[in-house]
A protein has these predicted regions:
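Active-site-proximal specificity loops/subdomain of glycosyltransferases
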Residues: 124-166
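Conserved catalytic core of nucleotide-sugar-dependent glycosyltransferases
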Residues: 182, 188-257
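Short beta-strand-to-loop acidic/aromatic patch adjacent to the donor-nucleotide binding site
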Residues: 170-178
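A conserved hydrophobic helix/loop-capping motif in glycosyltransferases and polysaccharide synthases
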Residues: 88-96, 111
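C-terminal catalytic/acceptor-binding lobe
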Residues: 30, 259-341
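Cell-envelope/extracellular polymer assembly enzymes that use nucleotide-activated donors
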Residues: 86-88, 117, 271
Length: 341
């Protein structure tokens, strides 16, 4: 979550209750294949998940059978994105949040657009495969989730840094691990992509005051570019609400880990922004952009977490200044795009 975007914190207890019910059903089924199926408790929660990919979790009377539902995937969705590249939704997490990650995953599995895969990138220095929560192992066994263990711990960067290398031909949508996403999050991003296929698409941007202060300009000179459905090089995406990246949006400099660690170790959004400017990739605030997603609320944060580091300690200012000093051509491109050069 970013302090420079309007924040709307809210619990989604109804969704969390349904998620917990579905989790209990799935876990009890894998642990005991003779478990009794309580349709009143679990049926509704599992029904939506069973529809994902055209399969079904349940069959028979008293012995629920969980099928690998992606094996015969036939998404029943009419979408203008039918001819787009394959779509990957990518996220990362860390040990304290893993027990609660299924809340975010359920919100993805109930999206109105179905034709995508989910990849989770974890640092092998933080967690081993045998330490994963059972629900994540179930998702992986069902084919709903690919879990990648990487050696280097690049914090929040992992969800895009490694996804771009593992899935170079994919559209990649990044999300956060402690949010519950609206059912139309992915479809809105893809509809925007269909209009502007070279651009990066976002539901949230950094505000004018922040960028203007770093660029040493009047906020009134930056504010006019923050509008929906209007690509602009100088827009800066905020990742929490979901960001879509087209295939191969960055140059090789994007993978410069030395620069990442030394210039912006805690702010992947700002590194992505500067790298997009260097590669002349515009950003688009999607049409009918969604409000800030609901927090899963029970997720455990790092101490200090990235919000505290970047906002309360003003590290966002320090990191963006460092990036623009290291890449003066990015500053020049931004000012030129604002017709201030």
């Amino acid at each position: 979550m970013d302090c420079h975007a309007l924040q709307s914190k809210a619990r989604n207890d109804k969704n969390l209750d349904s998620n917990n019910n579905a989790q209990k059903c799935l876990e009890s089924t894998f642990e005991n294949t003779h478990a009794q199926y309580d349709s009143k408790r679990c049926g509704g929660a599992l029904q939506a998940l069973g529809q994902f990919g055209g399969g079904s979790y349940l069959s028979g009377n008293d012995r629920p059978q969980i099928a690998p539902i992606l094996s015969n995937r036939s998404p029943k969705t009419e979408s203008p994105q039918a001819k787009t590249p394959p779509v990957l939704v990518s996220l990362t997490s860390f040990p304290a949040r893993l027990p609660y990650l299924h809340h975010t995953l359920y919100s993805l599995l109930t999206q109105d657009y179905k034709d995508f895969h989910i990849a989770l990138f974890l640092s092998s220095s933080e967690v081993r495969p045998d330490e994963l929560p059972l629900i994540l192992k179930i998702f992986a066994r069902l084919g709903l989730l690919s879990i990648h263990f990487v050696e280097e711990n690049l914090r929040a960067y992992k969800k895009l840094f490694y996804a771009l290398q593992a899935y170079p031909e994919h559209i990649i949508i990044t999300i956060d691990d402690d949010q519950i996403y609206a059912p139309n999050t992915i479809s809105l991003l893809l509809e925007s992509y269909a209009r502007f296929p070279r651009a990066i698409h976002t539901n949230w941007t950094y505000d004018a005051a922040f960028l203007a202060e770093i660029l040493d300009i009047d906020p009134a000179q930056y504010l006019p570019i923050i509008k929906e459905n209007a690509p602009h090089l100088a827009l800066a995406s905020v990742g929490v609400s979901g960001v879509l990246y087209p295939p191969s949006p960055f140059s090789q400099e994007f993978f410069n880990t030395h620069a990442i660690v030394s210039l912006a170790p805690y702010s992947d959004d700002l590194w992505f922004f500067v790298m997009s400017v260097l590669n002349d990739v515009p950003k688009v605030l999607v049409k009918n952009a969604l409000e800030h997603p609901k927090e899963s609320s029970i997720a455990q944060d790092e101490s200090p977490n990235l919000w505290e580091i970047n906002c309360e300690q003003n590290r966002n200012y320090d990191q963006l200044r460092a990036l623009l000093e290291a890449y003066p051509q990015a500053r020049a491109k931004i000012l030129e795009s604002l017709e201030l050069a």
